[in-house]
Amino acid sequence: MLSPRRTKFRKQQRGRMEGLATRGSTLNFGDFALQAQEPAWITSRQIEASRRAMTRYIRRGGQIWIRIFPDKPVTMRPAETRMGSGKGNPEFWVAVVKPGRILFEIGGVSEEIAREAMRLASFKLPIKTKFIVRSQPQEQE
């Protein structure tokens, strides 16, 4: 599962997810991509489940790029704890995703295979997604 090696601070405030993604909203590596249509926190477990679904489907051909990283710690209090006594301990890591953000990219496979792999990956995610195709194929150097 993905998580930062070390962070400056152990705990973060929750923040807000307003507006569209300004960075990470264009295809950079592969020929096909999965783009977020809704704002959400995507956990490292969901990212890993999506990655496994895609790699199992495309098998040995092609390459997958994960364009999001879970860098936000989410804290939780123990069950049946009284109010007060500070903030809970970090339990898991999430990636903050805004609409328009590219989540995954695939290259080196046909469009049908990429579309099906992305469809399987989207079932593991808590948001609506969109399949994107590069307008002109990328030249291999």
UniProtKB/Swiss-Prot annotation:
Keyword set includes Ribonucleoprotein: yes
Alphabetic keyword roster: Ribonucleoprotein, Ribosomal protein, RNA-binding, rRNA-binding, tRNA-binding
The keyword tRNA processing appears for this protein: no
TM spans (from-to): none
Record-linked PANTHER family: 50S/60S RIBOSOMAL PROTEIN L16 (PTHR12220), LARGE RIBOSOMAL SUBUNIT PROTEIN UL16M (PTHR12220:SF13)
Function of the molecule: Binds 23S rRNA and is also seen to make contacts with the A and possibly P site tRNAs.
Subunit-level organization: Part of the 50S ribosomal subunit.
Protein's UniProt name: Large ribosomal subunit protein uL16
Gene: rplP
